[in-house]
Amino acid sequence: MLEKIKKSFRSASSKNGSYSVGMIALVICMVIVVNLIAGQLPENVKSIDISDNNIYGVSKTSKKALNKLDKKVTFKIYAEKDSTDTRIKSFIKKYTALSDKISVKWIDPVLHPAALTKAGVDKNTIVISCKDTGKTKSVSFDDILVSDSYSYYTTGSSSASEFDGEGQFTSAINSVTSEQTEKIYYTTGHGEATFSDSVTKLFSKNNLTTDEVNLMMTGKIPDDCDLLFMDASSKDISDDEKTLLLNYLKKGGKVFIILGDSEDETPNLNEVLKEYGMQEADGYIADMQRSYQGNYYYIFPEITATDDLANNLESKMVLMINAHGLITTDPARDTITTTAFMQTSDNSYAVTEDKQEEGTYTLGAVATEQITSDDSSDSSSSKDSSSDATKTSRLTVISSESMIDSQITDTYTTLENLDLFMNAVTANFDKTKNVAIKAKSLEVSNNTMQHAGIISILTIFGIPLVILIYGFMRWWKRRKA
């Protein structure tokens, strides 16, 4: 009997069976080891985002901000964890894993109802706080999964159309850890345009507050003004306002002007531009070389921005419609430096009813001037000025309001109009960088082979094909045995 058993183990089939059992055991051991190793990896490494539009992805802007985070931040989540939307839970886990300065605590409002009252928030809210600064900011789940209000009014039901987890979290962390808040005053009384919701949200995400000012009524620029903004005025400023603006700039102030359409001449505004090395060309600009589908007044400017103005620009695709042109000239003082950051090609024309002037035109420019303490000792434009400080006055000009027009920025979401605009705004502040992240669309896109990623192709075709080939080779080898 014993000899029969020994003999059976010497047979070819027995050897093959033993080999198979050994291989299975080895594979099982390898799988266990790999899973143990994978379990120790950080959340941001072991999770792969296969969602449409990469909603779980974290941009370079946020990663830089989190890498520089030097204060401890706490996420207190007042919600039932099991019933929380999976997208929110997954993103919280991935985002907070990027910094060891962030701690997360879930508080169940059903088990601890008094916690909501104590915190002064509703359920499904994340309270982000920093103990060092004593600041807190609340982010509702509704701010993360943004519903389509238009769909609600047209169909009676609404669903999430955007995912804004990254934008809300990075903004909140920036807000609670920052020691200073910058304030923007926008002028009224000249038929100015109003900021779109998209621009207002980006201001808020960058911890910038806004308020209006009528310079004709006040006769001065507010003491707490960090940036004076004039958005596409349709009327000229008065002589007094011109003097006010020029004096403000000469004392180290910051002014941002977006040119508008005016039926009348604007000599006073033109004098402000001229003093800082800019002159408005007549008519509208048509670009024969860099236009949108042959419409020469729909221009893709050449972006020549550098440093902070070029922060996180990838495609450098900006669209401007019916733009006025600027011509750089010699400024009034040698201490003023004027630099263009948006230009047309050299095959462009300033078009009026009477003529067409060919040339290269500037569509966005910045003029700066170093101001000594003697020149600005009575200035109220900077909150942190000192008697021995040297300030930098800054005049930023963009030649068309279409740069931030919601009809363009909301329609062509891949353009970088708002990214460049916010860079131009935050460049006016020493301690503020553009960390505003736009919400990501949740619209479903058809995944055709033309756009399939390499991971999808390998998963769907590559791995099964390798298994089939290996199985066929094993079968063929055994068949020959």
Model-predicted regions and their roles:
Residues 2-481:
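Short, surface-exposed patches at the edges or C-terminal ends of soluble domains, predominantly
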